[in-house]
């Protein structure tokens, strides 16, 4: 079983894979990387600092205060392309 630090590193690697897959227009695979990272972060109850590093920070009105390793605009595009366009 992975330690918390090892899991954090794996999640950072998933973020790198996500960005690489987006550049290659592999939207379904990119979406899967994001969903896996999100599920693991929630299941492991990672610290808020790590979740913010990975997924960013939003303000009270929904504005993006800090971008994460999974940039929201790319996540939205991956979901759109994978779900609507089914590429």
Residue ranges and their predicted role:
Residues 1-10:
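TPR-adjacent "capping" and linker segments in tetratricopeptide-repeat scaffold/adaptor proteins
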Residues 33-57:
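Short, charge-rich amphipathic alpha-helical segments embedded
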Residues 46, 56-79:
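Alpha-helical linker/edge segments of TPR/alpha-solenoid repeat scaffolds
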Residues 85-87:
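Short acidic DE-rich linear segments
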